[in-house]
Regions:
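Flexible "arm" and connector segments at domain edges
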Residues: 1-60
Length: 60
C-alpha cells in the first residue's frame, strides 16, 4: 500500500467514526434535535456525514 492509499483509508476511517458518532447522538436525543451551539439539526449532520463517507468510498 502506498502513502496515498494509506491516507485515504485513514481519512475514510475517521469519516466512518464521525458517522457512527452522529448515529449514536440521534439514537440518544432524536433526529430532529440539535446542538445548542450551532442549531444544526441532527438530520442535517447525518446527511453531511453520510456524504463524507460516500466521497471517501469513491476515492477508494
Amino acid at each position: 500500500m502506498n502513502k496515498k492509499q494509506e491516507e485515504i483509508l485513514n481519512i475514510t476511517q475517521e469519516e466512518c467514526a464521525e458517522l457512527i458518532q452522529i448515529i449514536s447522538k440521534i439514537r440518544r436525543f432524536g433526529i430532529n434535535e440539535y446542538h445548542i451551539k450551532d442549531k444544526v439539526p441532527n438530520r442535517e449532520r447525518l446527511a453531511e456525514e453520510i456524504g463524507d463517507v460516500i466521497c471517501m468510498i469513491q476515492l477508494i
